[in-house]
Amino acid sequence: MKQYLLLAASAFLLQGCQTSKEDIKEQPLKMIEQIDFSHVKINDNFWSPRLSKHVSATLPVCSDQIENQTGRIRNFENAAKGEGEHSGIFFDDSDVYKALEGMAYSLINNPDPELEKKADEWIDKFAAAQQPDGYINTFYTLTGLDKRWTNMDKHEMYCAGHMIEAGVAYYQATGKRKLLDVCIRMADHMMSQFGPGKRHWVPGHELSLIHISEPTRPLY
């Protein structure tokens, strides 16, 4: 009896799970859209203390490392002047961009005029370091622009990707688009270098090109 009931139940479930190709075609596609983080406020008991620690400890340490303990921000200053040596490793620009992205996320839930002022100061340095053709990378600006885009392992696209992530995040957090415009010029420069009949590389941070499409969509 138990075996019969089990068999009958299985048959009933299988029958309910059957879907014809016609049924599948008639079902509307449901698009999943990412929610802009600037529309999200976090105030729960688990994450709020961690976000507070991010503001009070993580960001100050990151800023100190970038401005005082290493030459990362100085690389942008030197690149803007077109003189001086590059300090650190070739992908160090990305660490500055990551820290700025962290500032942007923090400003949503913890507005801080001083933190925003520091972010704006960094962005001014980025913009000053950008080349007339849109290229921005302090390593090659200071070691030889003739060598740019010759070695995929040197993280040029990777650094550009993190800059774009930071630029989009800061625009969403503050409405300020100075860094976003720097990112657009760099993206346009990369489009002039890569594609059919041009260079063929695997991008180092392809998701950033998707993220920049949202705030720039009305422009194209």
Model-identified regions with their sequence ranges:
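Sec-dependent N-terminal signal peptides
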Residues: 4-12
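C-terminal motif of bacterial Sec signal peptides marking the signal peptidase cleavage site
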Residues: 15-16
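Low-complexity, Ser/Thr/Pro/Gly-enriched N-terminal "stalk/linker" regions
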Residues: 21-95, 119-139
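Hydrophobic core segments within long, regular secondary-structure runs in both alpha-
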Residues: 44, 55, 100, 116-130, ...
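Conserved beta-strand->loop/alpha-helix structural units within folded catalytic cores of enzymes
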Residues: 93-105, 160-163, 176
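Aromatic- and glycine-enriched glycan-recognition loops and surfaces
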Residues: 109-121, 155-158
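A conserved hydrophobic secondary-structure block that centers on an alpha-helix together
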Residues: 143-209
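Single conserved hydrophobic/aromatic residue that forms the stacking wall/gate
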Residues: 211-220
